[in-house]
């Protein structure tokens, strides 16, 4: 007996890309009552009057017409500015390196958009993320990595709550990216050959330094080695991230070993950028971190200890860790020293294939001593 999905309404977040296009197509083919929604989160009109969002919405319209679903555009620019972009700027002001994608999923795609979809009578929202959800008999939802390891996006979805996941579908989670392209091409979708978007949505193809400089005044200062040698001037602490190699302008001229130079720390109060030679410079290595905004996708006790694996950045192999949780804070102790743990980035916890949740990195430590001098 086939399941009748026609009474289940799914509102799909459509970006004008191939992933969300195939998401809508698959749900339509499975018989769901599908509505496509294009989210306009940022005014990206350039000096020539060209707006990427306008072009993307045309692609959404073309695909929606092809597969026969209604579609609308909704403007979340204010919500995005207040909840994501202000956070992004505040983190850079504090000398950290934020991850706006994590916050965008938490606050916009699975909060503002989810609320909007529910007002349209949705039973679920769906997106083109590469992640999977499974449901226990009691209704508890588990979020699993996407089947395509190279595309898995659970790192960016790690702040989603059980309530958000209850209302979410990820139709691409079991597919490999080439299969998604193939489905789009077979169906003749207008977006089948469209390039994937990369980078932060509100920066796009713009020069990052120039973009950030429009909102935060750059404050040049001294570049120093950890042992106090003056290495010249930096252009502003916000432009550098822990472990960064390029853009320092100092080559391998001092130290004799000709190894490349890396950013190893920042002192916000003195406006000093610390640099050191060698990929595994001792100041880049740490044995634990402190995280805040720690959150799990399922109900957990207020205080507990967890043995699991973790990622400290996207596209990184898992590392074995011990997590000591107290409220929304955690100490994460590494089984092996880790390189370039970066304040502002997400730390995400896994149990095998399941993403358990995560938090935001506040500080890295080496044998109890703070590493980055922020």
UniProtKB/Swiss-Prot annotation:
Gene3D superfamilies: Adenine nucleotide alpha hydrolases-like domains (2.30.30.280), HUPs (3.40.50.620), Translation factors (2.40.30.10)
Pfam families attached to this UniProt entry: tRNA_Me_trans, tRNA_Me_trans_C, tRNA_Me_trans_M
Signal peptide region: none
Metal-binding listed as a keyword: no
Residues the entry annotates as binding ATP: 13-20, 39, 128
Top-level taxon in the UniProt lineage: Bacteria
Catalytic activities: S-sulfanyl-L-cysteinyl-[protein] + uridine(34) in tRNA + AH2 + ATP = 2-thiouridine(34) in tRNA + L-cysteinyl-[protein] + A + AMP + diphosphate + H(+)
Compartments where found: Cytoplasm
Residue numbers spanned by region Interaction with target base in tRNA: 99-101
Record-annotated disulphide pairs: 104-201
Chain positions covered by the region annotation Interaction with tRNA: 151-153, 313-314
Any single biological process term in GO: tRNA wobble position uridine thiolation
GO MF, any single term: ATP binding
Record: active site: 104, 201
SUPFAM superfamilies: Adenine nucleotide alpha hydrolases-like
E.C. no: 2.8.1.13
Keyword terms of this UniProt record: ATP-binding, Cytoplasm, Disulfide bond, Nucleotide-binding, RNA-binding, Transferase, tRNA processing, tRNA-binding
Annotated site, Interaction with tRNA, chain positions: 129, 345
GO terms under cellular component: cytoplasm
Role this protein plays: Catalyzes the 2-thiolation of uridine at the wobble position (U34) of tRNA, leading to the formation of s(2)U34.
Family the entry assigns: Belongs to the MnmA/TRMU family.
UniProt xrefs under HAMAP family: tRNA_thiouridyl_MnmA
Name of the molecule in the record: tRNA-specific 2-thiouridylase MnmA
Organism from which the protein derives: Streptococcus suis (strain 05ZYH33)
Gene: mnmA
């Amino acid at each position: 007996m086939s399941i009748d999905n026609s009474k289940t309404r799914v509102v799909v977040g459509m970006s004008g890309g191939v992933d969300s296009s195939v998401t809508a197509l698959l749900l339509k083919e499975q018989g769901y009552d599908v509505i496509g929604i294009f989210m306009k989160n940022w005014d990206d009109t350039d000096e020539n009057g060209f707006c990427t969002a306008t072009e993307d919405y045309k692609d959404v319209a073309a695909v929606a017409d092809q597969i026969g679903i209604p579609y609308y555009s909704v403007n979340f620019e204010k919500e995005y500015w207040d909840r994501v972009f202000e956070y992004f700027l505040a983190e850079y002001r504090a000398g950290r390196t934020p991850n706006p994608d994590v916050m965008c999923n938490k606050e916009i795609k699975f909060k503002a958009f989810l609320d909007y979809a529910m007002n349209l009578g949705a039973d679920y929202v769906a997106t083109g993320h590469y992640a999977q959800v499974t449901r226990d008999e009691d209704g508890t939802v588990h979020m699993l990595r996407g089947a395509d390891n190279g595309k898995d996006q659970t790192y960016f979805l790690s702040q989603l709550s059980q309530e958000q996941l209850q209302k979410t579908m990820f139709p691409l989670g079991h597919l490999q990216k080439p299969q998604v392209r193939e489905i789009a091409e077979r169906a003749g979708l207008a977006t089948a050959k469209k390039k994937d978007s990369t980078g932060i949505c509100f920066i796009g193809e713009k020069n990052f330094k120039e973009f950030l400089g429009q909102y935060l005044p750059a404050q040049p200062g001294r570049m120093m080695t950890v042992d106090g040698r003056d290495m010249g001037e930096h252009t502003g602490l916000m432009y550098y991230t822990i472990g960064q190699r390029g853009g320092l302008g100092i080559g391998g001229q001092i130290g004799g070993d000709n190894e490349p130079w890396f950013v190893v720390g920042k002192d916000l109060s003195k406006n000093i950028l610390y640099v050191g030679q060698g990929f595994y410079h001792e100041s880049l290595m740490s044995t634990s971190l402190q995280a805040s905004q720690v959150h799990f996708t399922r109900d957990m006790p207020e205080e507990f200890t967890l043995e699991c694996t973790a990622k400290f950045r996207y596209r990184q192999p898992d590392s074995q860790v011990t997590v000591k949780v107290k409220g929304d804070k955690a100490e994460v102790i590494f089984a092996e020293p880790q390189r370039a743990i970066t304040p502002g980035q997400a730390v995400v916890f896994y149990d095998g294939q399941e993403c358990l949740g995560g938090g935001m990195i506040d500080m890295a430590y080496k044998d109890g001593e703070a590493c980055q001098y922020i």
